[in-house]
Design a protein with these regions (language model features):
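Basic amphipathic alpha-helical segments that dock to polyanions
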Residues: 46-53
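The DNA-contacting recognition helix of HTH DNA-binding domains
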Residues: 40-41
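Short amphipathic alpha-helical elements of helix-turn-helix/winged-helix folds
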Residues: 12-19, 83
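Conserved segment of winged-helix/HTH DNA-binding domains
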Residues: 72-97, 115-117
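C-terminal regulatory/oligomerization modules of transcriptional regulators
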Residues: 94-167
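Short alpha-helical segments that sit at the start of domains
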Residues: 1-13
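A short alpha-helical element within helix-turn-helix/winged-helix DNA-binding domains
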Residues: 26-37
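Beta-hairpin "wing" of winged helix-turn-helix
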Residues: 53-69
Length: 167
């Protein structure tokens, strides 16, 4: 089963950064839940952990909500990962394998080291990326993917067509 805590928390953090840039001071857990395609209780659990680790702050109650606790440029993706994953291993070997040969006997130790190395490399990568830089990259992807769609739509409806009209 795929663990979606990190991508969901990252989407929440990116949404809060975007909201801040658009002049929306706070978002409710219900609003964020709609955006991430989840239920508010799941979002609140993630927000509680992010708040505990100083990544978001909020106001409780009917008119409350959450926002980033620091500027988006000062929050790394590694901080978000560590906050919501809470130190659990990235992967783990099966424990129910009978020890019959060199592979099955040492698989657990080998896989633990492999997992540790992979997670260290991933955290190095995530440490070099911030919420702000990630939002910038998303904007760039949006521009790249939206431009061809806009051009195709304008051709379909005849915008920018300098040739004779068929109407």
């Amino acid at each position: 089963m795929t663990d979606v805590r990190f991508p969901t928390a990252l989407q929440i953090m990116l949404s809060l950064a975007l909201a801040h840039e658009e002049g929306v001071p706070m978002r409710t857990s219900s609003q964020l839940a709609v955006g991430v395609g989840s239920v508010a209780s799941v979002v609140r659990k993630l927000l509680a952990q992010l708040a505990k680790d100083g990544l978001v702050t909020g106001v409780a109650g009917r008119s409350g909500g959450v926002r980033l606790a620091r500027p988006a440029s000062q929050i790394t993706l590694a901080e978000i990962y560590r906050s919501v994953m809470q130190g659990g291993p990235l992967w783990s070997a099966r424990k129910d394998i009978p020890h019959r040969c060199i592979v099955s006997t040492h698989m657990d130790d080998f896989f633990a080291k492999l997992t540790s190395d992979a997670e260290t490399a991933m955290l190095v990568s995530l440490s070099s990326k911030t919420v702000a830089s990630s939002l910038q990259k998303m904007r760039a992807v949006d521009r790249e993917t939206s431009a061809p769609k806009r051009r195709a739509a304008s051709r379909t409806i005849g915008i920018g067509n300098t040739g004779p009209s068929n109407h």
